[in-house]
Design a protein with these regions (language model features):
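A short glycine-rich, Lys/Arg-flanked "PGG" loop and its adjoining helix->strand segment in the class I
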Residues: 122-137
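Conserved class I S-adenosyl-L-methionine
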Residues: 137-169
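Core SAM-dependent methyltransferase catalytic element
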Residues: 175-176, 184-202
Length: 202
């Protein structure tokens, strides 16, 4: 897909996200097997340097803390509770996709189970490319669990099987990334399904 249709990024609930996420939610949005699969992917990709966790919360799914972990999200209470975080930033990416960091600040940018909520994902990923060092990775993991009223309509309109290609296309349109890699990490028969899309900063 070279462009997204009109209405793709509309949502059922168009209230500001700062209102929706005002109350902290100390829950995980994946089951234990899917969380373990996210952690295993991070290990396989060697995400041990300076990492930015976009749309983060009280937990980041690293088995071992990276050298530094900057968590960016909407709820300060959740971010403050994240034990691996070395820096915390409250920022609404749907209000402003511009990341408040210098060029080349990070070795990896991760987004776990939140890419479906972005109304300007291509701009956010272009910003991710800007703040990544050459050779760094953008890593998106996602399942079929979500707050459906906050997910964009385009995401809801395509099958689970096609969603990884949507995320890959977001990366292509963002520019500055090598061809994205797509993998289904868990098939969902015994746990939450899990897909991963990652791309290296050129």
């Amino acid at each position: 897909m070279s462009a997204f249709p009109d209405g793709w990024f509309a949502r059922t609930d168009e209230r500001p996200d700062t209102e929706f996420y005002a109350q902290p939610r100390f829950v995980t949005h994946l089951d234990d097997a899917a969380i373990a699969a996210v952690s295993a992917l991070y290990d396989e990709l060697g995400l041990t340097g300076d990492v930015l966790d976009l749309m983060s919360s009280w937990v980041s799914h690293f088995r071992t803390a990276p050298r530094s972990l900057t968590v960016l999200g909407l709820n300060a209470v959740e971010l403050d509770a994240n034990p691996m975080a070395t820096a915390r930033v409250v920022h609404d990416l749907n209000a402003s996709p511009v990341l408040p960091f210098e060029d080349g600040s990070f070795d990896a940018v991760v987004n776990c189970v939140s890419i479906d909520y972005l109304v300007r994902p291509v701009e956010v990923l272009a910003e991710a490319a800007r703040v990544l060092r050459p050779g760094g990775a953008s890593v998106c993991t996602f399942s079929n669990r979500m707050f459906s009223t906050k997910a964009v309509r385009g995401w809801l309109s395509v099958s689970e099987r096609d969603r990884p290609q949507v995320v890959a296309e977001y990366h292509r349109q963002a520019g500055l990334f090598a061809e994205p890699l797509v993998e289904q990490r868990l098939d969902g028969r015994r746990s939450d399904p899990l897909w991963a899309v990652w791309a290296q900063r050129a």
